[in-house]
């Protein structure tokens, strides 16, 4: 057993006691630490792989039960936001587990991006370890309280305007929006984009911005606003 980890402290934060504490140690062992430590033979990567699937199942089930009227596409949009690296990093922070990560000297976390990746992987690995040791129930008990409230999940479900417009046109018109691009110059003289979004050859919205992505977003939002689309999925709130 690794003497650098206070198993009891970590278990207290998880509110879960391992029957196989070695699983927890492995989950906390970054691959870089194993590479630099001759006595360590296992790292967190396999548990991370398992934990990713466990997290996906738990979040899918949670959303399915919480929003019985939501369609599959909208649920998928919310799930993606709840299981991405940024969210998993936040779960690690919320549990206060980051300080227990065993990481190699050559792999010290240098910036926010590095922290997000390392902490996200850590959460998934711990979830995989909990699942192997105690099954789905304790993994669910750890995860669900970390998820946003029902009210806060709704904006995640709506997604960005492009996705919402695509879902709308597919569902109601069985077609996809088409984006047309033209060069545009801002009042300050900067080069940008003028984008029109067409549905069934009809212009639904326009957007002007310096970046193509932002102009598309503005055009899609104008299309949604102009057609006064009321998302029926809000009935679940």
Swiss-Prot record:
<keyword id="KW-0378">Hydrolase</keyword>
<dbReference type="GO" id="GO:0003725">
    <property type="term" value="F:double-stranded RNA binding"/>
</dbReference>
<comment type="function">
    <text>Digests double-stranded RNA. Involved in the processing of primary rRNA transcript to yield the immediate precursors to the large and small rRNAs (23S and 16S). Processes some mRNAs, and tRNAs when they are encoded in the rRNA operon. Processes pre-crRNA and tracrRNA of type II CRISPR loci if present in the organism.</text>
</comment>
<feature type="domain" description="DRBM">
    <location>
        <begin position="160"/>
        <end position="229"/>
    </location>
</feature>
<comment type="similarity">
    <text>Belongs to the ribonuclease III family.</text>
</comment>
<dbReference type="InterPro" id="IPR011907">
    <property type="entry name" value="RNase_III"/>
</dbReference>
<feature type="active site">
    <location>
        <position position="52"/>
    </location>
</feature>
<dbReference type="GO" id="GO:0019843">
    <property type="term" value="F:rRNA binding"/>
</dbReference>
<feature type="active site">
    <location>
        <position position="124"/>
    </location>
</feature>
<comment type="subunit">
    <text>Homodimer.</text>
</comment>
<keyword id="KW-0694">RNA-binding</keyword>
<dbReference type="GO" id="GO:0010468">
    <property type="term" value="P:regulation of gene expression"/>
</dbReference>
<dbReference type="InterPro" id="IPR000999">
    <property type="entry name" value="RNase_III_dom"/>
</dbReference>
<dbReference type="GO" id="GO:0005737">
    <property type="term" value="C:cytoplasm"/>
</dbReference>
<feature type="domain" description="RNase III">
    <location>
        <begin position="7"/>
        <end position="135"/>
    </location>
</feature>
<dbReference type="GO" id="GO:0008033">
    <property type="term" value="P:tRNA processing"/>
</dbReference>
<keyword id="KW-0460">Magnesium</keyword>
<dbReference type="Pfam" id="PF00035">
    <property type="entry name" value="dsrm"/>
</dbReference>
<keyword id="KW-0255">Endonuclease</keyword>
<dbReference type="InterPro" id="IPR036389">
    <property type="entry name" value="RNase_III_sf"/>
</dbReference>
<dbReference type="GO" id="GO:0004525">
    <property type="term" value="F:ribonuclease III activity"/>
</dbReference>
<keyword id="KW-0507">mRNA processing</keyword>
<feature type="binding site">
    <location>
        <position position="48"/>
    </location>
    <ligand>
        <name>Mg(2+)</name>
    </ligand>
</feature>
<keyword id="KW-0540">Nuclease</keyword>
<dbReference type="Pfam" id="PF14622">
    <property type="entry name" value="Ribonucleas_3_3"/>
</dbReference>
<dbReference type="GO" id="GO:0006364">
    <property type="term" value="P:rRNA processing"/>
</dbReference>
<keyword id="KW-0698">rRNA processing</keyword>
<feature type="binding site">
    <location>
        <position position="121"/>
    </location>
    <ligand>
        <name>Mg(2+)</name>
    </ligand>
</feature>
<keyword id="KW-0963">Cytoplasm</keyword>
<keyword id="KW-0699">rRNA-binding</keyword>
<dbReference type="InterPro" id="IPR014720">
    <property type="entry name" value="dsRBD_dom"/>
</dbReference>
<keyword id="KW-0479">Metal-binding</keyword>
<dbReference type="GO" id="GO:0046872">
    <property type="term" value="F:metal ion binding"/>
</dbReference>
<dbReference type="GO" id="GO:0006397">
    <property type="term" value="P:mRNA processing"/>
</dbReference>
<keyword id="KW-0819">tRNA processing</keyword>
<feature type="binding site">
    <location>
        <position position="124"/>
    </location>
    <ligand>
        <name>Mg(2+)</name>
    </ligand>
</feature>
<protein>
    <recommendedName>
        <fullName>Ribonuclease 3</fullName>
        <ecNumber>3.1.26.3</ecNumber>
    </recommendedName>
</protein>
